[in-house]
Amino acid sequence: MCELNNKRVSWSKTGLIAYADEQSTYGNLCISFLETINGVNCRFHPPQRYVIHPQLHEVPLKTETGNGINGASGSSTAQSNIHGTTSVPGSAGKHQHQFFYDISSIHWNNWFSLPGDMLAVCDELGNMTMLIAGQSPDGPTTLDKLTMLFQDNVYKIHNHVMQLEPERENTDSKLERKKTKKEYNTTILDFHWLSSSKPVIVSQFCAFDSSINMYRNKAQQLSPHGIFHPPFMKYAGLAIRRNGQLDFWYQFSNSKDHKKITLQLFNPHNERSKGLDFLQYAKITSVNNDNSILITTYSRLTGKLSFYKLFVDWNVNTAKPVVLNDPSLKIKHILDATVDQTDDEGRILDFTHVHVLAKVVAEKDAAPEVLLAYDVVGTPESLIKRFKLGQVRLPLDYLGILKPELNTSNENHNQALRSNRSNLRFLGVLNLHHKVASISSEVLDGFVSFYYRNGEIEIYNQNDWKLETERLLNQGPQGKFSNIITSILSAGFKYPTIKNLGTVEWIRVSPAMAGILYKYRHDDLPQFQPMNIDDVSDKSKDEINAATMAFGYVTSAHRQLSGEDIALACKQHILKIAKIDEKRAKDFTTTLMFNLYNFFNFSPGAPKELMDKIISSRPLQKVMLLQLELGSIFTDENTCEMARVILYLKNVSFAFNGVARNLQFAIEQMTNSTNSSNPPLSGDKFFQTAFSKQDLVHSLIPVTKWFVKFITYLIQQILILTNDPENPDNRLVLGVFGAKIPRTLILTILKEIKNVTAIITKFPETNYPILNESSTYLKMLLIESPINFEKFETFLMDVNNKLSAFSEQQPSIMREPTLLVRSSVPNELNKITEFLLQYSSNTVISHADASAIYFSDTSGLRISCDEFFEPGVHRLLQPIEDGIVIDEKNMPATFRDSKTFTKLTYDGITYDRFSKEELSDNKLKRCNRCGAVTKAGYPIPTNKTIVPTSISTRRWPTMYTRMCICLGMLYEL
């Protein structure tokens, strides 16, 4: 059962993949992620390799600021009791020669509502190093940067904040990998993150509703269960070691120190064995029924399964909430059990693993389920015995004998039927036709993955223990519902079989269950294989397959997963269809996106109040990101262009809205300083405030240039279509003007532009006139636009009203999705095309210089893939039969650096043109999903401010340090 150590890899919600490196001589931890090459193909980013060794906490700090990382400082250590002590870390030269060891397990904080940015790394000796992504001692960084928070060397915890630097192969290091075959009794067997108190949204199923002739999904908000840390805690986690030692780590929100509490598991009947056990398996499970954590162990010495419950008292002081007390922990031994030696047929069984599942979704019986895995000796089979761990149920007749006075007919007799003792209630057996190499659970323990030794993987649903890939087989309708889908595999999608499993180091099902991640022992990088259906020729299955993929994507979005695994699975499936029939592939994409809008509960034709919420929501970005990725498949770029336009417009709206709010704040600050009785701002401080205010305006100049150019581009397309209505290359404008989402976004931007213009006109910068040039230039850009924005706004509002009236007269559920996805008007609704062309000519073009519009330079919008990606990679780089993820060795030699994929001309977030200095200072970031390159979040160079000053300004919010406008992850180039 130990053939695959699947705990040596962890795929974060953010998209980062951390895995152990057992071959390298200069590192033992790798960080990689999937990055887009050209919008269609992607690859694993070359791994950053780190060396995690027991003396890492002794390395001197490079910075003494100590801020930004969970408040932890680099100069204190906390002993293994509750109270912290302070000491100075040892010198790096203390050990002339040091060793590092193999990593035994890696754990991102992905559980429940946690964000997936903290990483617990455990080596085979039992040392645990806590890391965080996206933070440094000096503040926020990109997510691909790691910083150590503290290190636990089994007996002592060392608080030491230090940013980790990737190792290079040729560095002269005194660190040496030490291989050992010994099994240490301090090795961490399992690690569990405690959830925060935030609830999550869980998708339960989707089904076809015959009453409305479309698929509907059911989701519910789920509160955390078991033990979760209160808001005054930053995090909490616990681990179980081979010797039965339980370590509990935590940090208060107002504290710099990380603390640890240590307990020992032991059987009360044999206390002398305390700390001397040698566990083979251990599992920590957050259970739902009594606010506890279940700890399950199997001992080699005793041959017994033991079950314990951990209770945590957070010691909240209700009288003085500001007083924070350390938590108290209590362990209770609840049951011992033995494993079977033979089955019912007398065949010899070899016990191989124990796996425990929580019942996350509240049910009448929320007791955890225990799986005991056995190999059937002499056969290729395995069997899984299922048990329910709960309180002993006492029969009524038995109770009547023991206690005759008990009234068993009483309505409240149910309370007397359960004893305080626990037992394992047998539920059934799963007979598996292949030997099991490993077991894992997915999606909050709702699904169980069995990894077979022949390279196959199967997933069962915990609710009914049916094979997910066969869910729709022989499934009959239930009332008005049919085709009930519970996961992304329900429609018959399967995982590919992994070849040569004996050389595979680990395999894991991806976070959204849309594929498998695995690594061969002597390969540097892992491989990813999306789920698939071998035969895609049956067109009748397109509708249910599209609904299944949409349901899977919504499920991953609700769980805050990055979702690149499911995007790749969708792309691969559509590419297979496109190879047969491209029109059918476009229809499939439209159906998938239509279901996506439906499952997210927003209608593209919603009224204004709801539409305002939709355009500012995170789900809209997730939807447009998928449309962008799927649209990159087709030679007709309208699908991906529309997605990129909506993402860009959303960003422009965000920029103007943010600047307007910050301008108001700066003006109030300066006015209050002048008029109040408090001491006025000093000259330097006053200039700094004035400079920051006007620099906000300056940041809008490239954004405004892009917006003016984009509106001009749309009217250019109107001019072309007016003269040539059948022109196939200039139809994006029909989708932008015809669909309500982009129309609403443009109207919102025009409103924000008027707001900003009114502020800078009413409050010009008079104290430092040179700073007011940014306001003057911004107004000039708007005035000199070839499009009259007032007339244009009136036009869009009229279009809104007329199309809303048209929708009431001729309702159509597919009109808006078709406009949004294909940027085209359905043939049966050609009146919309005629109306848009005629009305825009009468209201917009008639009040402008048509020749000036037609000959305006609208290059550099970067809404098409041709403008975005380098020509050398802007194509399908290998046949789809060879996979959608490219091995770096198969790429053109000149296109192996991430810098070579995207055209480095314009900033993808600020819309500013890169200068030569910016391109050469090695401070560029790229999005792993859409491919945008940006410097947003970094200090602005002095040659790009109004006047050169010593004031450091970043302009764009901290959120753009880590995340792109499409919600992809930014990484440094």
Swiss-Prot record:
InterPro entries per the UniProt record, alphabetical: Mediator_Med16, Mediator_Med16_C, Mediator_Med16_N
Organism domain of life: Eukaryota
Biological processes annotated in GO: cellular response to heat; cellular response to stress; negative regulation of transcription by RNA polymerase II; positive regulation of transcription elongation by RNA polymerase II; positive regulation of transcription initiation by RNA polymerase II; regulation of establishment of protein localization to chromosome; regulation of lipid metabolic process; RNA polymerase II preinitiation complex assembly
GO cellular component: core mediator complex; mediator complex
Compartments in which it is found: Nucleus
Presence of keyword Methyltransferase: no
MF annotations from Gene Ontology: RNA polymerase II-specific DNA-binding transcription factor binding
Chief localization: nucleus
Protein keywords: Activator, Nucleus, Transcription, Transcription regulation
Assembly and binders: Component of the Mediator complex.
Family to which this protein belongs: Belongs to the Mediator complex subunit 16 family.
Protein task: Component of the Mediator complex, a coactivator involved in the regulated transcription of nearly all RNA polymerase II-dependent genes. Mediator functions as a bridge to convey information from gene-specific regulatory proteins to the basal RNA polymerase II transcription machinery. Mediator is recruited to promoters by direct interactions with regulatory proteins and serves as a scaffold for the assembly of a functional preinitiation complex with RNA polymerase II and the general transcription factors.
Protein name: Mediator of RNA polymerase II transcription subunit 16
Organism, as annotated: Candida glabrata (strain ATCC 2001 / BCRC 20586 / JCM 3761 / NBRC 0622 / NRRL Y-65 / CBS 138) (Yeast)
